[in-house]
C-alpha cells in the first residue's frame, strides 16, 4: 500500500518542499508506520511506500484539512 501520511487531528497531509528523495518524509513515514516503510516528497506532501494494508493514509473520512 502507498499513500500520503496524514495528521490524525486535522486531516492534513504532511507538507514538504524538497521534491523527490527527502530525509524528512522518509523519517516521518518510518516513525508513523514502521522501519521498512519508504518515503519521499511528491506534489509537496510526504508520500509513503511499502505500507501494511491497514495503514491509515490521506484522506481521512469526516476530516477536512483547512
Swiss-Prot record:
Protein's cellular compartments: Secreted
UniProt KW keywords: Disulfide bond, Ion channel impairing toxin, Neurotoxin, Secreted, Toxin, Voltage-gated sodium channel impairing toxin
Annotated tissue distribution: Expressed by the venom gland.
PROSITE patterns tied to this protein: LCN_CSAB
Entry's Gene Ontology molecular function annotations: sodium channel inhibitor activity; toxin activity
Highest taxon in the source lineage: Eukaryota
GO terms (BP aspect): defense response; envenomation resulting in negative regulation of voltage-gated sodium channel activity in another organism
Disulfide bonds: 12-65, 16-41, 25-46, 29-48
Record flagged with keyword Transmembrane helix: no
Gene3D superfamilies given in the database record: Knottin, scorpion toxin-like
Ranges for domain LCN-type CS-alpha/beta: 1-66
Keyword Secreted: yes
Primary location group: secreted
Entry remark concerning the domains of this protein: Has the structural arrangement of an alpha-helix connected to antiparallel beta-sheets by disulfide bonds (CS-alpha/beta).
Function comment: Beta toxins bind voltage-independently at site-4 of sodium channels (Nav) and reduces peak current and shifts the voltage of activation toward more negative potentials thereby affecting sodium channel activation and promoting spontaneous and repetitive firing. Has an inhibitory effect on voltage-gated sodium channels hNav1.1/SCN1A, hNav1.2/SCN2A, hNav1.4/SCN4A and hNav1.6/SCN8A. Reduces the peak current of hNav1.5/SCN5A but does not shift its voltage of activation. Also affects the inactivation processes of hNav1.1/SCN1A, hNav1.4/SCN4A, hNav1.5/SCN5A and hNav1.6/SCN8A.
Family as reported in the entry's similarity comment: Belongs to the long (4 C-C) scorpion toxin superfamily. Sodium channel inhibitor family. Beta subfamily.
Protein name: Beta-toxin Cb3
Amino acid at each position: 500500500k502507498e499513500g500520503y501520511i496524514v495528521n490524525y487531528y486535522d486531516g492534513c497531509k504532511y507538507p514538504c518542499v524538497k521534491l523527490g528523495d527527502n530525509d524528512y518524509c522518509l523519517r516521518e513515514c518510518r516513525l508513523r508506520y514502521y522501519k521498512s516503510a519508504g518515503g519521499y516528497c511528491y506534489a509537496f506532501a510526504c508520500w509513503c511506500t511499502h505500507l501494511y494494508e491497514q495503514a491509515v493514509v490521506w484522506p481521512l473520512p469526516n476530516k477536512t484539512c483547512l
